From Swiss-Prot:
EC number(s) per entry: 2.7.7.87
Natural source organism: Neisseria meningitidis serogroup B (strain ATCC BAA-335 / MC58)
Subcellular location: Cytoplasm
Protein known as: Threonylcarbamoyl-AMP synthase
CC annotations in GO: cytoplasm
Catalysis performed (reactions): L-threonine + hydrogencarbonate + ATP = L-threonylcarbamoyladenylate + diphosphate + H2O
Signal sequence region: none
Record-stated family: Belongs to the SUA5 family. TsaC subfamily.
Pfam family, one: Sua5_yciO_yrdC
UniProt entry keywords in alphabetical sequence: ATP-binding, Cytoplasm, Nucleotide-binding, Nucleotidyltransferase, Transferase, tRNA processing
YrdC-like domain boundaries: 9-189
GO biological process: regulation of translational fidelity; tRNA threonylcarbamoyladenosine modification
Main location group: cytoplasm
């Protein structure tokens, strides 16, 4: 089954509808639970920033099940860069790549032209994107100043019923993903 094993097909459809209405979802990733939404809905991005108490000028990461799922958001990278990304991913490595002009400023960050994208090493996160047939925003699941949630229980404590929770185990990664400028190769985190 392509979807994380704990969610039935009917729940998958309900989650898809919920996200299209601007809902937020928490799901396991490499190092913690991620908090996300559809990357194309300004309403959902605003809701996510408000819930996390996150400044809206900061950009957000978008994950996909493979590079091709992220391409509609990106200006076409060079063939060399595409080859490198396909070799690097899946991995806890986020790359900043030139975004298409249609990408919402709330997503890439105000006054920024690049978008942070990743194909995660966490198989459940990739399967979630594959099953929903869409990339997802992926920020750490926590309110500003609090530790990132590492369990479903911690998500419930911090966010209650404000988010749809996809249960599962996080990966073994201890630190957040690296962030690398795709054009310069410079490591930013």
């Amino acid at each position: 089954m392509l979807f994380p094993r704990i969610i039935a097909a009917s729940a998958q459809r309900k989650l898809s509808v919920y996200l299209k209405k601007g809902g937020l979802v928490a799901y396991p990733t490499e190092s913690c639970y991620g908090l996300g939404c559809l990357p194309t809905l300004a309403k959902a991005l605003g809701k996510l920033a408000h819930l996390k108490k996150r400044p809206q000028h900061k950009g957000m990461i978008v994950i996909g099940n493979q590079f091709e799922q992220l391409q509609p958001l990106l200006q076409m990278p060079s063939e060399n860069l595409q080859d490198m990304l396909r070799k690097e991913w899946p991995a806890p490595k986020t790359f900043l790549l030139s975004a298409k002009s249609c990408v919402l400023p709330e997503l890439r960050g105000k006054q920024r032209s690049k978008l942070a994208v990743r194909v995660p090493a966490h198989v459940g996160a990739r399967r979630l994107c594959q099953a929903l047939q869409t990339p997802l925003v992926s920020t750490s699941c926590n309110r500003a100043g609090k530790r990132a949630c590492r369990t479903e229980r911690e998500v419930r404590r911090q966010f209650g019923r404000d988010v749809w929770i996809v249960g599962g185990r996080i990966g073994r990664q201890k630190s957040p993903s690296q962030i690398i400028d795709g054009e310069t190769g410079k490591r930013l985190r």
